[in-house]
Amino acid sequence: MVNAAVHKVRFEPVGVDMDVMEGETVLDAAFRQGITLMHGCKEGQCASCKARLVDGDIELTKYSTFALSDGERDTDHILLCRTLAYSDITVELLSYDEELMHRSIAVKSYQATLTASTALTHDIRLLTLSIDAPLRFWAGQYVDITIPGTGITRAFSMANAPVNGTQLEFIIKKYSAGAFSSLLDGGLAPGAPLIVKGPYGTCFRRENRPGPLLLIGGGSGMSPLWSILHDHINSGEQRPIRFFYGARTQPDLFHLEQFAALEKSLPDFRFIPALSHADDDAGWTGERGFVHEVLQRSLHTDLFAGEVDAYSCGPTPMIDAVLPVLQLAGVEPEHIHLDKFTPALR
């Protein structure tokens, strides 16, 4: 982007200004300058960064009409991750978080090395990387990991609590046809070079909240929730915690010893695994059903005092099922934080 034209972007109603270069999306420009806007997939698929163009000339690159319908486009709605500016522009943010914007961290790239890949279940791996400089992030955020020379980039949430160190951990679900995850059992060996870019994500732990904490996940959604949980513990804050985790069968569960230890050491903590395919498992005495069903039952019986903060991370169908349960339970919209894991496009 050498000698690329530079334009001004004005965000209303927050009154924030920034620069954007031609050929750079508005969202990428915000990341570069440490301005965190609401976002999710960064690929025009999820609608998290939907906004409205008030003034100026723009172009939208390829996006899904599920994220931005033709009717919305006709009324000047845009996706910031797909928006290229060709003049100074003014954008109305339809969704924003003042705390998020004040806690922004500029996105940077890091040279990384794979140090270990450990099996937690038959299809869940714990990936450990070392990076060339400390990465500052908030618990619950994610990075893009690239395998150099392959064109393969995937987004993964950190599982470790943020300590400004040079080691990162990721809980990753392995897919046989996954361009990245299929390499975790031999294709990527310890010592393999990688590129890490981030941090991204708005589903990070909000601090100094006195009310109950709900963590709801499935599959590799454990990764950001594990980070949030341990960051909360490290903070010394005291609040009731319920950790709901959806899996198919008992062999799909992991970290059970760690959860049992936490239940003993924390004053009001419960780990509640939900098995969706436990009908033939006579040895299972825990909750049966999908995680949103178990969450709904629990919220009817578990009486909490104070405003609930809920964090839900995992596959899109799970998130779509969990959200109305939280809403019907009276959890305020600003206290619901979601991270939908959408399929990669590349």
Predicted regions and their residues:
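Short, surface-exposed secondary-structure boundary micro-motifs
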Residues: 54-57, 94-96, 148, 199
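Short, conserved phosphate/pyrophosphate- and ester-handling motifs at nucleotide-, phospho-/glycolipid
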Residues: 140, 221, 315
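Reductase modules of NAD(P)H-dependent flavoproteins
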Residues: 1-89, 240, 244-346
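Ferredoxin-reductase
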Residues: 102-193, 247-249, 274-278
